UniProtKB/Swiss-Prot annotation:
NCBIfam families from the UniProt entry: dCTP_deam (TIGR02274)
Biological processes annotated in GO: dUMP biosynthetic process; dUTP biosynthetic process; nucleobase-containing small molecule interconversion
Disulfide pairings: none
Keyword set includes Nucleotide-binding: yes
UniProt keyword terms in alphabetical order: Hydrolase, Nucleotide metabolism, Nucleotide-binding
Protein name listed in UniProt: dCTP deaminase
Pathway linked to the protein: Pyrimidine metabolism; dUMP biosynthesis; dUMP from dCTP (dUTP route): step 1/2
Gene name of the encoded protein: dcd
Assembly: Homotrimer.
Amino acid sequence: MSIKSDKWIRRMSEEFGMIDPFEPNQIKEADGQRIISYGTSSYGYDIRCANEFKIFTNINSTIVDPKNFDPKNFVTVEDDCCIIPPNSFALARTVEYFRIPRNVLTVCLGKSTYARCGIIVNVTPFEPEWEGYVTLEFSNTTPLPAKIYAGEGVAQVLFFESDEVCETSYKDRNGKYMGQTGVTLPKA
């Protein structure tokens, strides 16, 4: 299994729609202002956060149960940024839609810009033949409110191509998060 380069990421995105919309370069500035970078890097792709957020709330004092998740645990926000309360959590989705080839697995790591502020980004691997918008999980580990910027980079996806095609893909298993179109809450 080997990590894939910028040339491979460009080819797969331009010819096969692996990432849409796709940015072939690393973007570090918009409207004359520095931003948290996104786009193609040497051996990965920096994904952006869309402006759709779900922020945890304790208004309803329900229990967080991954097998029986109550949507009232979240407040929905659509904005240029999201303020995550201290020691709290939010969900968002990527700007980019992904179509992962059958012989590829990805690993996604949060950007150090956010990690250095105490904001942890978690994303599970994109499995072979999974497709959809990626649901992003943000944890604010600080005792202060924390800001996430829509339209800017939040994490880097690394692509690994297997030496052998898998016997059963995510699509073959009818994975429960296949074809996500927005922020997707937990499913059991």
